[in-house]
UniProtKB/Swiss-Prot annotation:
<keyword id="KW-0249">Electron transport</keyword>
<comment type="subunit">
    <text>Complex I is composed of 37 different subunits.</text>
</comment>
<keyword id="KW-0813">Transport</keyword>
<dbReference type="GO" id="GO:0008137">
    <property type="term" value="F:NADH dehydrogenase (ubiquinone) activity"/>
</dbReference>
<dbReference type="Pfam" id="PF00146">
    <property type="entry name" value="NADHdh"/>
</dbReference>
<protein>
    <recommendedName>
        <fullName>NADH-ubiquinone oxidoreductase chain 1</fullName>
        <ecNumber>7.1.1.2</ecNumber>
    </recommendedName>
</protein>
<keyword id="KW-0830">Ubiquinone</keyword>
<keyword id="KW-0812">Transmembrane</keyword>
<feature type="transmembrane region" description="Helical">
    <location>
        <begin position="175"/>
        <end position="195"/>
    </location>
</feature>
<feature type="transmembrane region" description="Helical">
    <location>
        <begin position="243"/>
        <end position="263"/>
    </location>
</feature>
<keyword id="KW-0520">NAD</keyword>
<feature type="transmembrane region" description="Helical">
    <location>
        <begin position="104"/>
        <end position="124"/>
    </location>
</feature>
<comment type="similarity">
    <text>Belongs to the complex I subunit 1 family.</text>
</comment>
<feature type="transmembrane region" description="Helical">
    <location>
        <begin position="71"/>
        <end position="91"/>
    </location>
</feature>
<dbReference type="InterPro" id="IPR018086">
    <property type="entry name" value="NADH_UbQ_OxRdtase_su1_CS"/>
</dbReference>
<feature type="transmembrane region" description="Helical">
    <location>
        <begin position="276"/>
        <end position="296"/>
    </location>
</feature>
<dbReference type="InterPro" id="IPR001694">
    <property type="entry name" value="NADH_UbQ_OxRdtase_su1/FPO"/>
</dbReference>
């Protein structure tokens, strides 16, 4: 029991540190793309800027609107943050290295991810602000729409694997990553990920020119920090899912021939060598996917809300349904259905 609690605390600290340095990386990358310096005073090369910002926000006064529902207004950011952190339970960092090895890991992640919408919806309603309410309505419609896209992609991948266990999905990609036969899904998954996390150019829930700051307009101090942590935690989490489902997760390309050259048998040295390669492959994929979020923010203008919703229901969803029909037909023709189906 004590060991499990320690593991959870270590995992949470690692996630929160990753969130902190993702914000620094985003600001430095955007500054480089826009030919300016960015944060460079707090710590070496600005590496401690995230902690300075966190202290500043935590020390600010929590101001609540007079006519708001105080209890729900304070609880809503916690709902968003907790659902973002619980999603990490089923994420494997390596073979057998996970907080909770669930046979229904995909279903669990979808269920927990869909609960995050309640935080934004309740925060907008309880703020007693028209800007916040409109932002929460936009957020709800956007998250529900693109949640359907992500669910469809999960179902297509489950057709290949015949399992809802994330580790099993990763291990079936030892021969070839699914992004190679399912290349269009990689692009669709990334687009849906950007929309699901409400990141630019799909940040219509908090468009400054229309809604001030969306559903967290009335937040300040620590409740605002919770929304901030939840947003960037979701970016890392959904990037991890993208890497696990389509990019082989912690697997690199087939390197078994290196073992035959370097080691005569499967010794502890070869085991450590494999762990080093797997962890490096996982880190490279995750950094690449998170950098893609930052690059899209700098490169593309914001969509209008009607274009965002129409893009989901008129373009992406019919395209996925077409893929949904093609893949089972192809598997049936070549008699390649998974044996468990």
């Amino acid at each position: 029991m004590i060991i499990n609690i320690v593991e959870i605390l270590i995992f949470l600290v690692c996630v929160l540190f990753s969130v902190a340095y993702l914000t620094v990386a985003e600001r430095k990358t955007l500054a480089y793309m826009q030919r300016r310096l960015g944060p460079n005073f707090v710590g070496y090369y600005g590496l401690l800027q995230a902690f300075a910002d966190a202290v500043k926000l935590l020390l600010k006064e929590i101001v609540l609107p007079k006519e708001s529902n105080y209890i729900i207004l304070v609880i809503s950011p916690l709902i968003t943050l907790i659902t973002a952190l619980i999603g990490w339970v089923v994420i494997p960092l390596g073979p057998g290295i996970t907080l909770g090895e669930l046979n229904l890991g995909i279903l669990f992640s979808l269920a927990i991810g869909s609960l995050g919408v309640f935080g934004s919806l309740l925060s907008g309603w309880s703020s007693n602000s028209k800007y916040s309410l409109l932002g929460s309505i936009r957020s709800t419609a956007q998250l529900i729409s693109y949640e359907l896209i992500l669910t469809s992609i999960f179902i297509i991948i489950i057709m290949f694997v015949s399992s809802l266990n994330i580790t099993t999905i990763i291990e079936t990609q030892r021969v070839v990553w699914y992004c190679i036969p399912l290349l269009p899904l990689l692009l669709i998954f990334f687009i849906a990920s950007v929309a699901e996390t409400a990141r630019p150019p799909f940040d219509l829930t908090e468009s400054e020119s229309e809604l001030v700051a969306g559903y967290f307009t009335e937040y300040s101090g620590s409740p605002f920090v919770f929304f901030f942590l939840a947003e960037y935690s979701n970016i890392i989490l959904i990037s991890a899912f993208n890497g696990y489902l389509l990019l082989g997760g912690y697997l690199s390309f087939n390197y078994s021939y290196l073992f035959n050259i370097l080691f005569n048998d499967y010794s502890y040295v070869s085991f450590l060598f494999e762990g080093l390669i797997n962890s490096s492959a996982y880190a490279i994929k995750l950094v690449f996917l998170m950098f893609s979020f930052i690059w899209v923010r700098a490169a593309f203008p914001r969509f209008t809300y009607d274009n965002l919703i129409n893009f989901c229901w008129i373009i992406l969803l019919p395209l996925l349904f077409g893929i949904f029909l093609i893949i089972p037909s192809t598997l049936y023709i070549f008699d390649s259905f998974p044996t468990l189906i």
